[in-house]
């Protein structure tokens, strides 16, 4: 039998597909399970478009199964009106009896209120499954709402003798290896902004 952790891991994998397209929203994946089998899945694909839970519900072919299914999601479902209606309303409307959540959303409009809305409508809620992994995935989003500042990465390269580049170098010079360059390009793709400067 597959565990809650197994399904939340699948949600995380789905959520990662939204990287570069959902900011300033978080990356969210959702899976719907009936009789220990996945019957629906979705992720937040683009900022302003349907959230993961809605896409997962929409992907279920036999909607009658939703009344006996469990919805898994890596981040607490939203409960406020923004560019889209609240995900909690969609879950409640479809009579999904159980929701398993990776971590709470620290955005002030949600922050435990999504869980409360579900429980107030007789939905069984379990949260904190693979919590640290889920927080790590959305560290930029959560940091912004927890600390009221952007998530910052500091990167620099220098030689062993503390120089930035050889003297009188008239052509491009790489101090870092290919693996480091690959990592930097990955970071640049994940961040919303980059500040470049010199001493």
Describe each model-derived feature in a short phrase.
Residues 20-23, 27, 46-51:
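A structural motif shared across PLP-dependent enzymes of the aminotransferase-like
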Residues 27-36, 156-157:
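Short beta-strand scaffold segments in enzyme catalytic cores
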Residues 31-33, 39-43, 70-72, 100:
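Short, conserved beta-strand segments within well-ordered enzyme catalytic domains
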Residues 45-58, 175-182:
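A short, polar/charged loop-to-alpha-helix boundary motif
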Residues 43, 50-51, 71-90:
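Local cysteine-cluster metal-coordination motifs and their immediate loop/turn environment
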Residues 1-22, 38, 63, 67, ...:
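Zinc-dependent deaminase
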Residues 38, 44-50, 106:
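Short active-site-proximal "capping" loops at secondary-structure junctions
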């Amino acid at each position: 039998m597959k565990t809650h952790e197994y399904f939340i891991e699948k949600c995380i994998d789905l959520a990662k597909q939204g990287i570069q397209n959902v900011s300033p929203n978080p990356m969210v994946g959702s899976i719907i399970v009936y009789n220990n089998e996945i019957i629906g899945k979705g992720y937040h694909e683009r900022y302003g478009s349907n959230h993961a839970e809605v896409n997962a519900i929409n992907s279920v072919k036999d909607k009658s199964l939703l009344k006996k299914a469990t919805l898994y999601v890596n981040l607490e479902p939203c409960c406020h009106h923004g560019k889209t209606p609240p995900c909690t309303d969609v879950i409640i409307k479809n009579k999904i009896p159980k929701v398993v959540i990776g971590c709470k959303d620290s955005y002030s409009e949600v922050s435990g209120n999504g869980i409360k809305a579900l429980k107030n409508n007789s939905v069984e809620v379990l949260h904190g499954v693979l919590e640290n992994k889920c927080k790590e995935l959305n560290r930029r989003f959560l940091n912004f709402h927890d600390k009221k500042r952007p998530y910052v990465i500091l990167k620099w390269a220098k030689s062993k003798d503390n120089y930035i580049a050889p003297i009188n170098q008239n052509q491009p010079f790489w101090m870092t290896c290919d693996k480091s360059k690959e990592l930097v390009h990955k970071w640049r793709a994940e961040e919303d902004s980059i500040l470049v400067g010199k001493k």
